[in-house]
Amino acid sequence: MGRAGTGTGGEAVAAVVAGPLLLLLLARPPPASAGYSGKSEVGLVSEHFSQAPQRLSFYSWYGSARLFRFRVPPDAVLLRWLLQVSRESGAACTDAEITVHFRSGAPPVINPLGTSFPDDTAVQPSFQVGVPLSTTPRSNASVNVSHPAPGDWFVAAHLPPSSQKIELKGLAPTCAYVFQPELLVTRVVEISIMEPDVPLPQTLLSHPSYLKVFVPDYTRELLLELRDCVSNGSLGCPVRLTVGPVTLPSNFQKVLTCTGAPWPCRLLLPSPPWDRWLQVTAESLVGPLGTVAFSAVAALTACRPRSVTIQPLLQSSQNQSFNASSGLLSPSPDHQDLGRSGRVDRSPFCLTNYPVTREDMDVVSVHFQPLDRVSVRVCSDTPSVMRLRLNTGMDSGGSLTISLRANKTEMRNETVVVACVNAASPFLGFNTSLNCTTAFFQGYPLSLSAWSRRANLIIPYPETDNWYLSLQLMCPENAEDCEQAVVHVETTLYLVPCLNDCGPYGQCLLLRRHSYLYASCSCKAGWRGWSCTDNSTAQTVAQQRAATLLLTLSNLMFLAPIAVSVRRFFLVEASVYAYTMFFSTFYHACDQPGEAVLCILSYDTLQYCDFLGSGAAIWVTILCMARLKTVLKYVLFLLGTLVIAMSLQLDRRGMWNMLGPCLFAFVIMASMWAYRCGHRRQCYPTSWQRWAFYLLPGVSMASVGIAIYTSMMTSDNYYYTHSIWHILLAGSAALLLPPPDQPAEPWACSQKFPCHYQICKNDREELYAVT
């Protein structure tokens, strides 16, 4: 069967030597353990695929993983993945292990956080490998997959889960981890085609023989048989057959070893995948010097479908347009040829086809329903089958939801409706087994009874293929009770981007990798999981309201600097503080998830105004402390605010958006204070009370607030630490505002309007002079 192996290397085979390494891989023959030898190189060709590297992120949700999509050609016999990882050299770079997930047909369903999935969700663990980065800044790993399934293969890579710490962009040193996968495909070009019921002679030497057989629609069974086996190196028939492809994470590839097996050697495959080529590899087990001769025969058992008549429906809906799965309406001439060339099942019918309408509603959003828009009739003689076409290549990025509901009046205590959901081919063996297993796929079972008339199934990221829903009526206690029984089942079949739109505590986001689109949920308020349904760390409604009140009411602390500014006639500064208080309050009221939400404007507008107000408040406070000339101060107020607005438009979360203007304002303030100290030959401000009761407490509050804002905030304590930041910022502004200008002396010159008299103070004598 297919193997997946890993290997790690050091700096000598790092990303910088990826080109020479791939040339060596191209020149080297496949390993002998995979069943290949140098003589088989004549019939094998190699192809190389690569994608641009991407910077990895620490995992917090599915959007943190970097997704790569590769197209594997048909007749591939070996995949060699070269996984290259590199990092920057610096103190910020630590040892880490990159996790790489693989899946065939759809993006891998991963769960690094160990969260729970919604009820009725079918999840298969992903196949993954780890690439450590410890002593060297570069590392690589290789993964081999023999006999891979053709079509789309997806690779997802990510760093370990994040620490949930909120860091300012540009403040803390960062480390870039870069990942690049490359794919080397070995495919066979010399392959023999097996025709149904026609023996195909084969002679095996030291290299394997590659065969393939086409399985058309409505094939119930495929029988592979080895006949007339002759070997000169051992007794019996030393041949190993490998049938079918490898699909990670699950693998149902069949391996038949005929040594010592009953003669003739046979392999029966129920419900093989329809409408595709099935690859068969024959290998000799006698060693390099022995030969084995045999004849391979493929026998197909045709399935006669009973089709639901839809002509009256089509005639009554001529003005409507449907995209129907017409392949399920009636047997085509090809199906009749299959019956003549293969074997026809003796029963009159093996399944009942129900035509299905596919309605494309939006991106990764499809609605399936029976063409007659009524329920499906389920009986006991044959399965009722519905085909869901999810083979466009763009349908694997959502979630397939299936909901069944049985008619209450028709369900009796002794009857059970059994359903199976399978890809590639329907499950038809309800009379012999209920495990929903076809030749190369483990299906998903559902059941309806008188006690449970509803059944649901959710398949995240379904594989690109035709999916089939099979239903049949069963009577476990007495089969005769089901002979005349009929149950109508209502089906609700959807492909949705996100289940329930991620609920009230999540947001469904559409992600893109080149032209491929897929969806995922981003959760809030402590909710986690695939659809934001895991409440193990969730906040209660009371906690959400308390958090909202903390973040909004803490802005009332800005009333203190507003009052101080008005009292000291700093009206422009008071206006800036009022603006900051207003938009910070309503931004945080809109930023909350769940029920405690209030948005008076769009979220983006509120966020921009909040960031602008915060930067402008710090800017005007520092400039006000500089005690500039009135005209110059207001000019700098305006210019600084315009610069902050421009920088926020360029990068809203950049650290230098606020730090740059604030440092410039601090330089102006320090220069003015130094000038006054030199001019007056004493410390400025001159009053020790000003230093002790205003400046030092204000600077201390601002320093503590900056420390909390830059180094202590996490996703868990954000509501408390950010509220403290609001209080400290507003309190420091109230303390740092300078006192008003000194009032005019009684004898200072003042202009009397409108009489145009000027009263002046005489420095030599206390007399008034009227001019």
From Swiss-Prot:
- Gene Ontology biological process: lipid metabolic process
Q: Which residues are glycosylated?
A: 144, 407, 431
Give the enzyme class: hydrolase
Any transmembrane segments, and where?
Answer: 546-566, 569-589, 606-626, 630-650, 654-674, 691-711, 718-738
Q: Which coarse location class describes where this protein primarily resides?
A: membrane
Tissue expression:
Expressed in pancreas, placenta, spleen, liver, kidney, bone marrow, peripheral blood leukocytes and tonsil.
EC number(s) in its UniProt entry?
3.1.1.4
Question: What post-translational events are described?
Answer: Glycosylated.
**Does the record carry Lipid metabolism as a key word?**
yes
Q: Which domain of life is it from?
A: Eukaryota
Assigned protein family = Belongs to the TMEM8 family.
Q: What name appears for this protein in its UniProt entry? A: Post-GPI attachment to proteins factor 6
Gene that encodes it: PGAP6
